[in-house]
Amino acid sequence: MSTPEKRPVSFFSLFNRGQHYAKTWPLDKRLAPVFIENRIIRATRYAIRIMPPIAIFTLCWQIALGGQLGPAVATALFALSLPMQGLWWLGKRSVTPLPPSILNWFYEVRGKLQEAGQALAPVEGKPDYQALADTLKRAFKQLDKTFLDDL
């Protein structure tokens, strides 16, 4: 059985994938001990909302107090880069293949969805974290909340 080769993902498409992954991942408290995504997604959303005003404030404040332009711009660029780092990490995580322990769990969740009568598309190649996020989102919508207890 040959798996299709995945081409490397471009640097800029990782940001779009990270945004999609953040929207897809179910933010359930029961997933937090196993997956770090809950914390990263919350921190990234917070940074997207807070860092642009902080960058503008620090830029204006340093210039108004007679500071030099170079450090002011560097501080503003650093503040603006924080949400981008979160999106980049999420994008990189979304295309990472699942490790064997989580892969077994992924197939168990898919099996529970199929037992419940849900039609699922076949998995192509090795599943990644985006496929896990899609499956978990669907499981949280269509299965009862106790499906995680059995796994």
UniProtKB/Swiss-Prot annotation:
<protein>
    <recommendedName>
        <fullName>UPF0208 membrane protein KPN78578_26420</fullName>
    </recommendedName>
</protein>
<comment type="similarity">
    <text>Belongs to the UPF0208 family.</text>
</comment>
<dbReference type="Pfam" id="PF04217">
    <property type="entry name" value="DUF412"/>
</dbReference>
<keyword id="KW-0472">Membrane</keyword>
<feature type="transmembrane region" description="Helical">
    <location>
        <begin position="46"/>
        <end position="65"/>
    </location>
</feature>
<feature type="transmembrane region" description="Helical">
    <location>
        <begin position="69"/>
        <end position="91"/>
    </location>
</feature>
<keyword id="KW-1003">Cell membrane</keyword>
<keyword id="KW-0997">Cell inner membrane</keyword>
<keyword id="KW-1133">Transmembrane helix</keyword>
<keyword id="KW-0812">Transmembrane</keyword>
<dbReference type="InterPro" id="IPR007334">
    <property type="entry name" value="UPF0208"/>
</dbReference>
<dbReference type="GO" id="GO:0005886">
    <property type="term" value="C:plasma membrane"/>
</dbReference>
